[in-house]
């Protein structure tokens, strides 16, 4: 599939002279990609039907079984090879509403392996880490977060990619935005260091201080796309919220407007489950003792 995509783009953009290829194998690959590509159908089945494929989830197992069945339908031997165990977990419903200072439904989802809220959810004020001068300042502030949601990510001044700014903004506007963003990032990491924690362990401090949940937003610097990794909490939910919604919560909290959100986040623990690699094999004829290995991440 990877070769098919690559050659298909080559066929589309190169001139006829540049595409003159005599090798029959390469010509066959180009013809297959150009005239018989199944990439869109396969992507639909895997992305739209199966969906996200976190290791240890039923969806990951569904994807493995789908791949084996698909290979078999092509006459290719395939099987799932168990290589270990993993934490079994499944994301359920995530619903987030801002209820103060106005009503607005927010776009977000649970981080991987996030604990659940109670069935009816939790409603609480949203706060953020203030600018501090010492670890003592931070420890004193921790005493104020009991029963609240905490914003744990850096605020982003824009949701547009740099390439979009470069194309549409004035050069001086683009340069100012980059400088402002770099300064915000410098101050954020400096403030984090003053807490005495790192980004891997600070969430535990929030949880131990009585926060009811954490709200994060890890922007990928591509319009509309966040990176969603794993929660680092044991008992409280960690919710990822889209950049624009996170920015609104941040500005409200920063300006003393005390936003309130209601979060319903359900998930299911499935205990320890087996994990697999899906392996398919097309046996060679000319050199049966040699291997060409094509591999890729199947989890997502």
PLM feature spans:
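Soluble metallo-hydrolase cores and metallopeptidase-like ectodomains found primarily
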Residues: 24-25, 115-139, 228-300
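Loop-rich non-cytosolic ectodomains and luminal regions
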Residues: 150, 186, 194, 198-199, ...
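Solvent-exposed loop/turn segments at secondary-structure junctions
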Residues: 52-53, 84-88, 133-134, 156-159, ...
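Bacterial Sec-dependent N-terminal signal peptides
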Residues: 1-17
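Noncatalytic luminal/extracellular "stalk/propeptide" segments of secretory-pathway proteins
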Residues: 12-16, 22, 35, 44, ...
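Solvent-exposed, acidic/flexible segments
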Residues: 19-22, 32-40, 53-64, 192-199, ...
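Structural recognition of the beta-strand scaffold that forms the well-ordered cores
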Residues: 42-45, 79-80, 126-128, 149-153, ...
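Extracytoplasmic/secreted proteins, especially bacterial periplasmic and envelope-associated proteins
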Residues: 21-28, 38-41, 45, 62, ...
């Amino acid at each position: 599939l990877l070769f098919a995509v690559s050659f298909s783009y080559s066929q589309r953009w190169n001139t006829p002279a540049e595409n003159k290829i005599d090798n029959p194998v390469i010509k066959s690959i180009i013809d297959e990609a150009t005239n018989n590509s199944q990439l869109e159908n396969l992507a639909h089945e895997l992305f739209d039907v199966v969906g996200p494929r976190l290791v240890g989830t039923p969806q990951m197992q569904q994807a493995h079984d789908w791949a084996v069945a698909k290979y078999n339908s092509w006459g290719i031997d395939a099987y799932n090879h168990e290589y270990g165990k993993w934490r079994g977990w499944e994301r359920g419903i995530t619903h987030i509403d801002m209820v103060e200072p106005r009503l607005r439904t927010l776009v977000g989802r649970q981080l991987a392996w996030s604990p659940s809220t109670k069935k009816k959810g939790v409603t609480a004020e949203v706060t953020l880490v203030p600018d501090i001068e010492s670890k003592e300042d931070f420890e004193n502030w921790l005493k104020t977060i009991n029963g609240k949601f905490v914003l744990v990510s850096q605020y982003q001044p824009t949701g547009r990619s740099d390439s979009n700014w470069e194309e549409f903004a004035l050069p001086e506007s683009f340069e100012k935005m980059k400088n402002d963003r770099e300064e915000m990032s410098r101050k954020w990491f400096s403030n984090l260091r003053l807490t005495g924690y790192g980004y891997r362990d600070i969430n535990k401090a929030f949880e131990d201080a009585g926060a009811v949940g954490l709200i994060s937003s890890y922007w990928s610097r591509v319009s509309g796309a966040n990176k969603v990794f794993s929660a680092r909490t044991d008992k409280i939910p960690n919710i990822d919220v889209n950049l624009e919604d996170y920015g609104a919560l941040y500005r409200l909290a920063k300006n003393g407007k005390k936003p309130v959100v209601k979060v319903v986040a359900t998930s299911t623990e499935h205990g320890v489950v087996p994990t697999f690699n899906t392996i398919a094999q097309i046996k060679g004829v000319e050199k049966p003792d040699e291997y060409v290995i094509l591999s890729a991440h199947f989890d997502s």
